[in-house]
Amino acid sequence: MDNRRCFLCGRNGAQDPLERHHIFGGAYRNKSEKYGLVVDLCGDRCHRNGSLSVHRNGNQMRMLRRHGQLKAMREQGWTEDDFRQEFGKSYL
């Protein structure tokens, strides 16, 4: 049984299949993978095309990056400066 849910809306992906989103993309995509900074999102609604999707809504993207930074700092025992060294800037 698959218990995955969209990080943003909580749906199970039955109507809109879930996609894996790397919180820090581009040059930091591999580091997102390495540190587990990925979330499942409804592919159309929450990931790519909805008005509140992370690729169309700056507030959603900022919220996810803040969440990702706090998760990384907590799990890795990092300071804000440590995070900055790994990911180039702080999102707090």
Question: What are the language-model segments listed below?
Answer:
Residues M1-E19, D44:
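Short cysteine-rich loop/turn motifs with clustered Cys
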Residues V38-L64:
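Short Cys/His-centered divalent metal-binding micro-motifs
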Residues F24-V39:
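Short linker/helix segments within small regulatory modules
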Residues H21-G25, H55, R66:
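A near-ubiquitous, low-amplitude feature marking generic local secondary-structure context
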Residues N12-A14, G25, T79:
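Short, solvent-exposed coil/turn linker segments
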Residues L18-G26, G43-N49:
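Histidine-centered catalytic micro-motifs
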Residues M63-L92:
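Short flanking/linker segments adjacent to small metal-binding domains or redox-active Cys/His motifs
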Residues D16-E19, L37-V38, G68:
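Amphipathic alpha-helical interface surfaces
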